[in-house]
Amino acid sequence: MNLNFMPLLHAYNHASIDFHFNSSARDFCVHEVPLYEFSNTGEHAVIQVRKSGLSTLEMLQIFSQILGVRIAELGYAGLKDKNALTTQFISLPKKYAPLLEKNTSNFQEKNLKILSLNYHHNKIKLGHLKGNRFFMRFKKMTPLNAQKTEQVLEQIARFGMPNYFGPQRFGKFNDNHQEGLKILQNQTKFAHQKLNAFLISSYQSYLFNALLSKRLEISKIISAFSVKENLEFFKQKNLNINPNTLKALKNQAHPFKILEGDVMRHYPYGKFFDALELEKESERFLKKEAAPTGLLDGKKALYAKNLSLEIEKEFQHNLLSSHAKTLGSRRFFWVFAENVTSQYVKEKAQFELGFYLPKGSYASALLKEIKHEKGENNDEF
């Protein structure tokens, strides 16, 4: 497989929308929504921190330096953007809590502010978040493009959007996935085990994005062409499908087609199950009750069946499925933005957008779907 980045298909068919977005503390805000309420009792202090111009790991280093706490003692649910104004929760042993207020000015000098202090009985771990609320400000937006953006947002609100991994996953030079494959091939290895695991996960992410784009291509072809033309397309791809199934797929109202053998999952949390009745599952998908999932290949990954598996095979890798420390999983192909709000400020030619996404989903995927930049690649911003 070609490991260079290829343009990823969009869900919707509008023309490119021209505007400027700068990922900065003024124009991009991220607010973490915790997975559970904190009990206000326990051996761990939980603080809500606002930061700007800092990565999460840089923030943890500052806390370690100022408070004398070991980084291993600090807990956090996820990594937040450096070029944004972000709030997130971190935990630390209760004994360090009295030092927080004493060092307020020291934190402020580092672009950190503690917004709240609570307590809980366990340390915050990776994944202990429900999702994130986002705010984005688009500039140099004409009234016509603002109207087009609203129309796209209506489609996203109704049908959702592709759940692509964002460019952060692939590094500054878009080569994390290539390094991950080299690790699997025993061509390179780093001393830090977490770095090795992250780079391998970047390769998984690359394959997932490519599979999702391929599925979008197939969905668009099913919608755009006749049953006869589709049969010829599937024949050329050595994929078996009968005319009645194609007719049923064309009748699915959602732009992303549920295929025979897809692994579905109750949305946004729940068990995996096979898509047996395509019409029924497509209706549930349209109602946002369940959604199809894509492969993150690994030793214990759950694979699709039938037609879905035939397509998925191209994006499997035996080095992933045999790698002892890469267990694998599945990820929603599709995600639904919630609480979408928008406002066009005509006198400033600015468009303000707010929305919520569940954990693991990227604001960059929504921006990509709106903008439809020509010649677009994963490193668009």
From Swiss-Prot:
Entry annotated with the keyword Amino-acid biosynthesis: no
GO CC annotation, single: cytosol
One of the protein's GO biological processes: tRNA pseudouridine synthesis
EC number: 5.4.99.27
Pfam families assigned to the protein according to its UniProt record, in alphabetical order: TruD
Keywords tagged on the record: Isomerase, tRNA processing
Family annotation (CDD domains): PseudoU_synth_EcTruD
Catalysis performed (reactions): uridine(13) in tRNA = pseudouridine(13) in tRNA
GO MF term (any one): tRNA pseudouridine(13) synthase activity
InterPro entries: PsdUridine_synth_cat_dom_sf, PsdUridine_synth_TruD, PsdUridine_synth_TruD_CS, PsdUridine_synth_TruD_insert, TruD_catalytic, TruD_pseudoU_synthase
Matches recorded under Gene3D superfamilies: TruD, catalytic domain
Residue ranges annotated for the TRUD domain, each copy included: 160-335
Recorded superkingdom: Bacteria
Catalytic center residues: 81 (nucleophile)
Family statement drawn from the similarity comment of this UniProt entry: Belongs to the pseudouridine synthase TruD family.
PANTHER family reported for this sequence: TRNA PSEUDOURIDINE SYNTHASE D
Function statement: Responsible for synthesis of pseudouridine from uracil-13 in transfer RNAs.
Entry protein name: tRNA pseudouridine synthase D
Organism of this sequence: Helicobacter pylori (strain Shi470)
Originating gene: truD
